[in-house]
Amino acid sequence: MSNFTAKVPLSERMADVLISKDRWKDDEEGYLKVKYGLEIILINVMKFALVYGIALVTGLLLQTVTVHLSYLWLRRYSFGLHATKTLNCTLISLMMFVLAPFVFQNIPSNNWIVLGTFGFILLNMFLFAPADTESLPLIGEEHRKTLKRKAMIGTLILTGIALLIPFAEMKTLIMVGSLFQVISINPLTYKLLKRRYRNYEKYE
């Protein structure tokens, strides 16, 4: 029994503690949905705490926030790949939002570099956004067109922010976070990771 328990993910064990199965004894499907949702929340909270805890301890909090917000700003409408395993997701998050800010924090960029980089990013948004996954197919051509348009507008807004911000090192961190999102929507990344691209085609 102890061996089995040890193999159960921490998030699942915490979800079992937080919700009472007895209250859902007449609705097994409802219980599983609530439990799954709670597990996702717990996983994200723990991952967030780990990433930002390390960033805080290492003095990288501002750098981590800059890279992360730039990434999330573009990801909101362009979507892209997700890691299929929690451990992989956590390790990738640490590399993207702790290691990368550490490496690039003291590298300055000028506005010509910003314009060139965001020109490349905008082109990728035009060509590849939004990119879906097997678990989240983006169904509906008009829906995808709307997301693409919003992703491109978001890119232009972020370009303006990067151009206007007076700190050369901050410009670099904004570009790093944005390029991470470009990688997540590029079909070459899907191919290298052997993930299915254009998953919506299966449903249309």
UniProtKB/Swiss-Prot annotation:
Enzyme class per UniProt: hydrolase
Membrane-topology descriptor: Multi-pass membrane protein
InterPro entries named among the record's database cross-references: AgrB (IPR006741)
Keywords: Cell membrane, Hydrolase, Membrane, Protease, Quorum sensing, Transmembrane, Transmembrane helix
Pfam families with a match to the protein in the record: AgrB
Residue ranges crossing the lipid bilayer per the database entry: 52-74, 87-107, 111-131, 151-168, 173-190
One term of GO molecular function: peptidase activity
Keyword Cell cycle: no
Compartment annotation: Cell membrane
Family membership: Belongs to the AgrB family.
UniProt protein name: Putative AgrB-like protein
Originating species: Listeria monocytogenes serotype 4b (strain F2365)
